[in-house]
Design a protein with these regions (language model features):
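N-terminal acidic, proline/glycine-rich, low-complexity intrinsically disordered segments
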Residues: 1-19, 23
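N-terminal secretory targeting modules
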Residues: 3, 28, 32, 467-558
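Hydrophobic membrane-embedded alpha-helices
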Residues: 3-5, 14, 67-82, 86-509
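Residue-identity detector for glycine
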Residues: 11, 32, 37, 48, ...
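Short, Lys/Arg-rich, polar N-terminal cytosolic tail immediately upstream
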Residues: 24-31, 35-76, 333-337
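A generic local structural motif
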Residues: 74, 543-546, 594-598
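Conserved SGNH/GDSL esterase-like catalytic core that processes O-acyl groups on lipids
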Residues: 550-616
Length: 616
């Protein structure tokens, strides 16, 4: 049974008989050479010394081979950056509200699977090298990788909203702390905020919900894996545990989804989304070479047939004259299925099917469909695994295509693009802008997002990831330099930080709360109310008295809203006689629909019904 590597190396292990000679461990072949005796071309040496050296070398080589087999190799896979590019492009297209990319929100699912896969590869590689997981070091690396860019985006967005859009500043105020502390998703759930239905501009920090789920995974998964390693749980059993947890999470999404309610609880929840990360983690336990076509045939139980076709062996693995004697037991020709799974094309077919499936889901699904929550997100995760399997085979067609330099370039900056695109696109495309945006403006907006992301990647993420902050602090401690001298040497950086902080903090402190109906909309209503004739106002008052309680006959206009609608009650009643506002703080669309059904049952819903929900 395959185990996690322990601190003490084991002795050499002989390759299975059904394994092809070229697949046997190097140490086994060396041991075979030693059994045949020294080469006549070598200088004779002491036999005892030679045997000892041979055995020691075989043991070391076998132990090294075992570790290499037990862990995924720590190597850079450029095709995975190409897959990141496809994911972030899907998300950006979705937030541009393009009708042919309403399923672009599935790009986040692709990110989840990739994150679970790559993080688990790193952890398994560390276990293979050291036999343990340094949790403190892991979390410090995650903080250096993620937090500097997050803090920058939050404060720059505050500054931009202070200058350009006070409604967005009001929306993002309560989201700042949850975003910085990575519990944004649970905050949105607690506030009953819909991801899909919002009146007016949403919070520019809404997209931080996915970062929160990833950080929560990084907080819980490494200790859990370390615990299983410490308890010497075998790799097959660990894989079963991971797959079981993923199944529970996927089932939770299906069970908790209610077609009659807003799906945001299921969409935001860590418990209902973590299966994508866990499926990626599960795949990380499979060595890259086991995803090669011949090894896939082995896992499918086709290895003997594949070996027969390739090496001319019989069903019992014999060759030569014995193979001729047993020819009756060996198949004359391998089946088409065997030939397919043994060919390099098989893994590319999996990858292409995965890519086509993902593209179809982006084009044909959206966040409202029941399919999305009753198997669609799970299917997206499985399709992503198929693409990853093709990406880790560097000679494959899919891997070469996704390793194209432009795709890799964008993929390396996908985290920055994801962070910056949402607030920038919201500021450039506010809800109040009802004019059609020409295609060339969208292109300019995307180019601006990429330019800002490049600056963030080059001047914020990369220096922090490479330890620039730690080195600067060390210089302060050693007395090599002082904060004042450092500031004089980095005047542009300090000036930019100071300007952003002053504007952002000034906006948070001094700009009053502003809502979609408390600004220009409220001014229009108040102006109209003042211009209303006294006779009309008296008629409205008389009508309101008749409407107290639930009057006979329906309202001419019924408005069902949340707390923002309450602010317009006085002006609304003056402008629209025989009308009624039913407003409640924190009300969302599912509750608004139930309220509306109540008015229908009492014959009070008139010809015009206004829903003003999702603003808070």
């Amino acid at each position: 049974m395959e185990q996690f590597p322990q601190s003490s190396p084991r002795g050499p292990r002989r390759a299975p008989d059904n394994q092809a000679p070229h697949e046997r461990p190097r140490a086994d072949r060396r041991t075979g050479e030693s059994r045949r005796g020294p080469s006549p071309h070598r200088t004779p040496t002491n036999k005892g010394s030679h045997a000892a050296k041979t055995n020691t070398g075989a043991t070391r080589s076998s132990a090294t081979d075992q570790q290499a087999t037990a862990r995924p190799k720590s190597r850079y896979i450029p095709a995975l950056d190409g897959l990141r590019t496809l994911a972030v492009v899907a998300v950006v297209l979705y937030h541009l509200n393009l009708t042919w990319a309403q399923g672009g929100l599935l790009g986040v699912t692709i990110f989840f699977v990739l994150s679970g896969y790559l993080i688990t590869r790193l952890l398994l590689n560390e276990v293979a090298k050291t036999g343990r997981i340094d949790l403190k070091s892991f979390w410090i690396r995650r903080i250096r990788r993620l937090v500097p860019a997050v803090v920058t985006v939050v404060f720059v967005t505050c500054a931009l909203c202070t200058i350009f859009n006070h409604v967005m500043l009001t929306k993002m105020r309560p989201d700042i702390l949850p975003s910085l502390l990575f519990f944004n998703n649970w905050w949105q759930i607690a506030q009953n905020v819909s991801y899909f239905n919002a009146l007016g501009d949403p919070s520019p920090l809404t997209h931080f919900w996915s970062l929160a789920i990833e950080e929560q995974f990084y907080l819980i998964w490494p200790p859990l894996l370390f615990a299983m390693v410490s308890m010497h749980v075998s790799k097959p059993n660990t894989r079963r545990v991971v797959l079981g947890l993923a199944a529970v999470s996927a089932l939770a999404m299906m069970v908790l989804y209610n077609p009659a309610a807003d799906p945001s609880r299921v969409y935001y929840g860590t418990d209902t989304r973590v299966f994508s990360l866990l499926l990626g983690a599960w795949m990380a336990f499979i060595p890259d070479r086991d995803l090669a076509p011949v090894r896939l045939a082995h896992r499918l139980g086709l290895n003997r047939l594949a070996g027969t076709a390739k090496h001319g062996k019989n069903a019992e693995g014999k060759s030569g004259e014995k193979a001729d004697e047993s020819a009756e037991t060996a198949p004359a020709q391998p089946s088409a299925l065997v030939r397919f799974w043994s060919s390099p094309a098989s893994i590319d077919v999996l990858g292409v099917v995965g890519l086509v499936g993902l593209a179809a889901m982006v084009a044909l699904t959206n966040g409202y469909t029941a399919f999305q929550y009753r198997g669609g997100t799970l299917l997206c995760s499985i399709l992503t695994l198929m693409v990853i399997a093709a990406c880790v085979q560097p000679q494959g067609m899919v891997a070469r295509a996704l390793s194209a330099e432009p795709l890799v370039w964008v993929g390396k900056r996908s985290y920055s693009i994801y962070l910056w695109h949402y607030p920038l696109l919201l500021l450039m495309n506010p809800v109040a802008n009802i004019n059609d945006t020409p295609w060339w403006q969208y292109i300019l907006q995307v180019l601006l997002v990429v330019a800002v992301a490049e600056c963030s990647y080059r001047f914020i993420e990369t220096p922090f990831r490479k330890g620039a902050f730690g080195r600067t602090v060390a210089e302060f401690r050693d007395g090599t330099t002082t904060p004042a001298n450092w500031a004089r040497a980095h005047v542009p950086v300090c000036a930019a930080c100071a300007v952003v902080l002053v504007i952002a903090l000034g906006g948070l402190i001094f700009v009053p709360e502003t809502s979609a109906l408390s600004g220009e909309g409220a001014e229009v209503l108040n102006k109209e109310a003042k211009n209303t004739a006294p006779a009309d106002q008296q008629a409205a008052d008389d009508t309101d008295k008749d409407n107290d309680g639930f009057p006979d006959g329906s309202y001419d206009l019924l408005m069902i809203g949340d707390s923002v609608s309450l602010r317009a009650v006085d002006s609304f009643d003056g402008v629209f006689p025989h009308s009624h506002i039913d407003a409640e703080k924190g009300r969302q669309f599912d509750a608004g629909r139930a309220t509306f059904e109540g008015y229908i049952q009492q014959n009070l819903a008139g010809k015009i019904v206004v829903f003003a929900l999702g603003t808070n």
